[in-house]
Regions:
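Short amphipathic alpha-helical interaction segments
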Residues: 2-11
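Helix N-cap and loop-to-helix transition residues
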Residues: 4-5, 75, 142
Length: 170
């Protein structure tokens, strides 16, 4: 384990969220995923690049599939693939290569410091791509990764994560 990962494991073990093996304590899974999401906000992910709003996550996924670029939906679009509960406010995708993916999808970078709607591409990091699933022909990150990302997201994403965790009714 890297020192930062070990630090988080120690913190979460001290407050009773994980056991000595690093596994979530029964009944504490949602609490652990909430804390992980809040500690790793989507807006601050390493290598994340924002692009001008335009295509939906599903459209971008199709462009990437046609170009042979590895990807996985997350955030509200990913949560909706597991259980539809809200409109898509912010397309966020993990990709194997941000520049190639942006080119294939015809995305234009947002100006630094600009606000408003956006599309965000985040490079795979060795963890986010583990457990991906195909849902109706679209690749989506593992359910727990969607939940972490939704808890680390904006607006209705937190509610979507709660719905996926059974903490709220759609």
């Amino acid at each position: 384990l890297t020192p930062p990962v070990d630090m988080w494991r120690q913190r979460w073990a001290r407050i009773g969220l994980i056991d000595g093996d690093g596994r979530a304590v029964a009944g504490k899974e949602a609490d652990l995923l909430i804390r992980a999401g809040r500690a790793a906000r989507l807006t601050r992910r390493a290598g994340a690049v924002d692009f001008a709003a335009g295509p939906t996550a599903g459209q971008i996924a199709e462009y990437l599939r046609r170009a042979g670029i590895d990807y996985a939906l997350t955030g509200d679009a990913g949560a909706n693939r597991y259980r539809s509960s809200a409109g898509e406010a912010w397309p966020v995708l993990y990709v194997e290569d941000v520049d190639r993916a942006a080119e294939a999808a015809g995305l234009a970078r947002k100006e630094p410091g600009s606000f408003g709607m956006r599309v965000t591409l985040i490079p795979f990091d060795g963890v986010s791509e583990v457990g991906r699933v195909d849902i109706a022909g679209v690749t989506v990150v593992a359910r727990d990764q969607v939940v972490i990302d939704a808890y680390g997201g904006i607006d209705r994403m937190v509610e979507q994560a709660d719905i996926l965790m059974g903490r709220r009714v759609a």
